A protein has these predicted regions:
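N-terminal [4Fe-4S]-dependent radical SAM core
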Residues: 1-54, 59, 63-69, 259, ...
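Auxiliary Fe-S-binding modules of radical SAM enzymes
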Residues: 1-8, 193-194, 198-295
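Core AdoMet radical
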Residues: 45, 62-73, 80-97, 103, ...
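Acidic (Asp/Glu)-rich catalytic clusters
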Residues: 78-81, 130-134, 167-172, 200-201
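Distinct, well-ordered alpha-helical segments
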Residues: 100-102, 126-133, 191-195
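Alpha-helix N-cap and loop-to-helix initiation/capping positions
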Residues: 153-160, 187, 223-234
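Conserved strand-turn element in the central/C-terminal portion of the radical SAM core barrel
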Residues: 166-191, 195, 211-214
């Protein structure tokens, strides 16, 4: 029996290795320093932060942890001259800001060669607002496949709004549309293939599946919600769920993680765990003053 189990594990390990070798880096991660393993302390590509406020209160969110600890970045541009890509934004919900259209236009003029990415929970995106925005990539967060589960995770009854946002961006083929999903085993692992199927049916181009980072202030909330902390750190579990979602959509996992996994052999992939705990999230890029005046 022991030999049979070992053979089965080796077969699964080889399948995981093949899957990893074939995976592409998320479109959003392209140009990020994390893809270059020769960089000792890589940072995320630049972002423009509009507000740390959010109309969701997600049980896993790093942004609300930063707010509680007084470490959320102040509004402004965090990056450098000649960026390849800029995200609006990494903290808070950018569509809450009345300056979203103004800043979007300013960044397009100020950095005409840069790719502009919008990261949003989608709940405030309407057809009217969408017509005023100009982005190359839109990432919409969705971590549940039902209204009830979505409300439990986000503490907001906005599931239908988020689905509508996916429909809006999925229909616009001038942008790369991405559903951004956090892997929370015990909470949403069964939802992830359903999210992938739903997003694909709405014309969304890609799923960016990310491993959970457990921030200390969120531990109790995640525990009450049913998180399996051990499985949350298992690369094997993450990859198995990604393989299931791949049946429906172009699924990709975090680029800085993927480049490391591609260097591992099959059995290492099968057995490795990722330490997923962190006390406080920090922006590692310096704030740079740029003008935001409209012509």
């Amino acid at each position: 029996m022991g030999i049979e189990v070992e053979i089965l594990e080796n077969k699964e390990a080889k399948e995981l290795k093949k899957f990893v070798d074939e995976l592409m880096v998320p479109t959003h991660c392209q140009f990020c320093q994390g893809l270059d393993l020769s960089i000792e302390n890589p940072v995320h590509h630049p972002s423009y932060e509009l507000t740390p406020a959010c109309n969701h209160d997600c049980i896993f969110c790093y942004s609300n942890v930063a707010v509680k600890l007084g470490k959320a970045p102040k509004p402004g541009y965090y990056g450098w001259e000649n960026p390849r890509a800029i995200t609006i934004s990494q903290y808070g919900e950018p569509l809450l800001s009345p300056r979203i259209v103004e800043v979007n236009k300013m960044l397009r003029r100020r950095f005409p060669e840069a790719r502009l990415d919008l990261q949003t929970n989608g709940s405030l995106l309407t057809e009217g607002l969408w017509q005023k925005l100009d982005f190359d990539i839109v990432m919409i967060s969705l971590d549940a496949a039902s209204r009830e589960k979505h409300k439990m995770i986000t503490n907001a009854d906005t599931f239908d709004n988020v689905v509508n946002a996916l429909r809006i961006v999925g229909a616009d083929k001038s942008v790369r549309s991405i559903v951004r999903t956090i892997f929370m085993p015990g909470i949403n692992d069964e939802d992830i293939p359903k999210i992938a199927e739903l997003a694909a049916s709405l014309g969304v181009d890609e799923m960016m599946l990310q491993p959970l980072t457990v921030h200390k202030l969120n531990e109790e909330r995640l525990r009450k919600a049913g998180l399996d902390f051990e499985r949350a750190e298992s690369i094997r579990e993450l990859l198995k769920v990604a393989m299931g979602a791949k049946k429906y959509i172009d699924v990709r996992i975090s680029g800085c993680l993927l480049v490391q996994l591609k260097k591992m052999d099959a059995l290492t992939l099968y057995n490795i765990y990722k330490i997923s705990k962190e006390i406080s999230p920090l922006v590692k890029r310096k704030k740079m003053g740029i003008k935001a005046k409209l012509r």
